[in-house]
C-alpha cells in the first residue's frame, strides 16, 4: 500500500515551550491551509525525531518535545490528517526499539523513516540497531518503512539499492534545490527492478535564510559541486521577492515532476517550512501543487 500523500513536516517545539507552542503550530496549519486552498489536501504530517547534531548548527538545538507527545497534542487539532515520522535507530537496542515502534504504530503513525547516526559520526558507530537492519527486522511491525535518500551524495545508488533489498518501501529525499533527483532516479530505474515510493521533499526559503543560513547548513556536502550549486540557488531564493521566489520554486517543482513522473516510481510530496509554517510558505506550496499532486484516493 503506497502512502500516496502530501505530507507537511512539523518539527516538535522545544520541550520548555511544550503544549502551548504545539497547539499554536497545529492551529497555524489549519489556518494557512484554509487561506491557501490546501484545506483537505494535506494527508499527513511528518514529525522528525530530532537528535543533537554538530556544534556549528546555525540555530542551537535544544531538547525537543518527544514525537509521540507532540503527535498526541496536535492530532486532535488536525482532523483527517495522519502521522509519519522519523526514528533514530542507532542508539537503541532491539527490544527498546521494538517497544518504541510498537508505541508509534499504536498512536497511528502510518510510516516510519529509519535514521542512523548524525553526519559527525561514521555509519555503524551507534551502539544500537543500524537503519538497514531495522528495515528487515521490523517488516511485520511497520508496513511503511522509509529511508532517507540524498541524490547528490556519492555512492547513493548502491546505498539506496541495498536499503530497498533490505525492505525499504519508500525513500524520503533530502530537500531538493536542483533537479539532481531526476538523473538519479532515471539511472536507478535502468539498473534495478526496485520501484519504492519516493517522497519528493521541497522546502520554502524565507528571507531569514540570508541571515541565518540553516538550510545552507542542512544540505551542505563540502567538495560536492552539485550541492554548491544548490546552495547558490538557496541564496537566490532567500534574496528574492515573494512573486519571483514562488516562480523559482514552481519552475523547479515542474522540472522534477516532469522528469520523474514516467519512471514507474509511486510519488508523494513532502513539504517543509524549515523556519516554521507561514502564510507565504503555504501560498508557495499551493502554487506548486496546482501543477501536480498525488491523486486523491476515492
Residue ranges of model-derived segments:
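N-terminal amphipathic alpha-helix/helix-capping segment at the start of soluble metabolic enzymes
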Residues: 1-11, 15-16, 20-23
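Conserved, mostly hydrophobic/aromatic
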Residues: 9, 45, 104, 163, ...
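Active-site pocket-lining/capping segments in soluble small-molecule metabolic enzymes
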Residues: 17-39, 113-120, 124-152, 187, ...
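Glycine-rich anion/phosphate-binding loops
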Residues: 20-28, 89-103
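Glycine-rich, positively charged N-terminal anion/phosphate-binding segment
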Residues: 23-32, 51-78
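Glycine-rich, proline-tolerant flexible connector loops at the mouths of alpha/beta enzymes
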Residues: 36-67, 117-126, 168-189, 270-279
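Ligand/cofactor pocket segment of small-molecule handling proteins
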Residues: 141-169, 173-178
Amino acid at each position: 500500500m503506497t502512502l500516496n500523500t502530501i505530507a507537511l513536516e512539523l518539527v516538535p517545539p522545544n520541550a520548555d515551550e511544550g503544549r502551548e507552542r504545539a497547539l499554536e503550530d497545529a492551529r497555524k496549519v489549519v489556518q494557512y491551509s484554509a487561506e491557501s486552498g490546501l484545506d483537505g489536501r494535506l494527508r499527513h504530517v511528518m514529525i522528525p525525531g530530532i537528535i543533537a547534531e554538530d556544534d556549528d548548527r546555525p540555530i542551537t538545538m535544544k531538547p525537543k518535545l518527544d514525537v509521540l507527545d507532540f503527535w498526541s497534542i496536535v492530532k486532535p487539532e488536525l482532523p483527517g490528517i495522519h502521522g509519519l515520522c522519523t526514528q533514530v535507530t542507532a542508539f537503541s537496542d532491539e527490544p527498546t526499539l521494538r517497544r518504541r515502534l510498537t508505541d508509534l504504530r499504536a498512536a497511528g503513525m502510518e510510516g516510519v523513516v529509519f535514521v542512523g547516526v548524525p553526519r559527525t559520526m561514521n555509519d555503524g558507530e551507534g551502539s544500537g540497531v543500524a537503519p538497514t537492519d531495522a528495515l528487515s527486522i521490523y517488516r511485520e511491525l511497520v508496513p511503511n518503512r522509509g529511508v532517507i535518500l540524498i541524490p547528490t551524495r556519492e555512492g547513493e545508488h548502491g546505498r539506496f539499492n541495498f536499503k530497498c533489498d533490505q525492505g525499504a518501501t519508500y525513500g524520503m529525499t533530502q530537500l531538493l534545490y536542483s533537479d539532481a533527483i531526476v538523473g538519479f532516479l532515471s539511472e536507478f530505474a535502468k539498473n534495478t527492478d526496485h520501484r519504492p515510493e519516493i517522497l519528493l521533499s521541497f522546502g520554502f526559503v524565507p528571507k531569514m535564510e540570508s541571515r541565518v543560513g540553516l538550510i545552507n547548513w542542512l544540505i551542505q556536502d563540502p567538495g560536492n559541486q552539485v550541492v554548491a550549486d544548490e546552495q547558490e540557488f538557496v541564496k537566490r531564493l532567500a534574496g528574492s521577492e515573494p512573486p519571483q521566489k514562488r516562480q523559482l520554486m514552481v519552475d523547479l517543482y515542474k522540472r522534477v515532476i516532469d522528469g520523474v513522473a514516467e519512471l514507474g516510481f509511486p510519488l508523494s510530496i513532502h513539504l517543509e517550512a524549515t523556519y516554521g509554517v507561514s502564510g507565504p510558505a503555504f501560498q508557495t506550496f499551493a502554487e506548486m501543487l496546482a501543477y501536480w499532486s498525488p491523486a486523491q484516493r476515492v
